[in-house]
Amino acid sequence: MKTADNGTVNGSSKHETGPLEDILEKKPRKSFISRRSFLSKTIALGAGTVGAGLLSNIRAAETGSSLSAGDAALLRFPAALEILEADFWIQYNELGGIQDDEVPGGSGNEAYAEALEVIEDEMGDYIHDNTDDEITHHQFLNAYLVSKGAAPANLDAFRTLMGSTATGVNQNKIGHRLTNLTRLQIDTSWWTRYRDDSHNPDLDPNFVFPQAVPTLAQNRHTAIPRDDADTTHPLFLKAIANTAAFHFPTIEQGGSSLYPALAQKATDVEVLRILMSIGPTETMHFQTWSDVAGNAPPLTAIDPKTGVSVTFPDLEVENELLDKALIMPEPCPFLSRSLPIVSVIRPTNPQGAAMGALRFLRNMGLFIGQSQAFFAYMTQLAQEADAATRGF
């Protein structure tokens, strides 16, 4: 259990999402000169040129890597996603999590935190610890890539989005976010997918799983207070907290599928081990948040700025596809319908998994406001991961 330490709210963090050179300061220096040169050049690039520049530098750096290009790509793409994930979890933590020196923080927003605690009284701890986990994921993946002579993922040039200006945010990060939590369109079909014993997206790619919260999949919704005005509308603030509660598992179920999908392409046994060791932690996050989301209070609220309405239904129902009590993954068809049904993560089909994950996040609205250079860079990383093939 984490406790608040107000004396270190704005202090440095041992898991600060800073330049990779700082993270690697304590690592052995052997053969790091060319990689450090690579880092200094890429970090200095402007957002307008970083797409092409980073991609060409990545290809050049791979020449001396002890990893195959495919295995490096299988780690670099999730490293980039983990950087993005850490970025939005840090935003959640600044406003609604525990403020201490373990993760980068703000000073907290009492009204938002209280709205979250209506859903789960340990919400601040959960947000804090999930934030911590995602930071360690991208730091480890990038450090491992560099230790093998491969280029890391680097998104520093794309930290250009505004983010929230509400009380509690880190003022130094306003205008320097990677992700946008204020215009989300959230696909909650995972809720019914994991309760359905007859369908699996790997076998039924055209089957449409019903939404748990249909209005979240329509229009755009904010999961954090955009400014202090948002906290003055009690019912709408509850809707913001509910939106966050469903955004959390929506993100984490994606990681639960991505890691095992990419692992099927790995050649190096250590790369396989990394993917299979990080992936289950995403599933642990998903399981926690999927349980928490069921506690979101039923309500209907209207965004006072956009006029968009959102309705959170009562999920304490007899319908087994929607019943919030049924949190265990229902057995379903897997590999072939000639085999017995089995409880599994789904989907895990490796074909196009990385591009599918990137499309999912883009359609969610998480990158609204990002540059074309950002999308070019992320698309290239995803395509290279999807192109990887097992070498035996």
Task: Specify the residue positions occupied by each region the protein language model found.
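Twin-arginine (Tat) signal peptide motif
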Residues: S31-R36
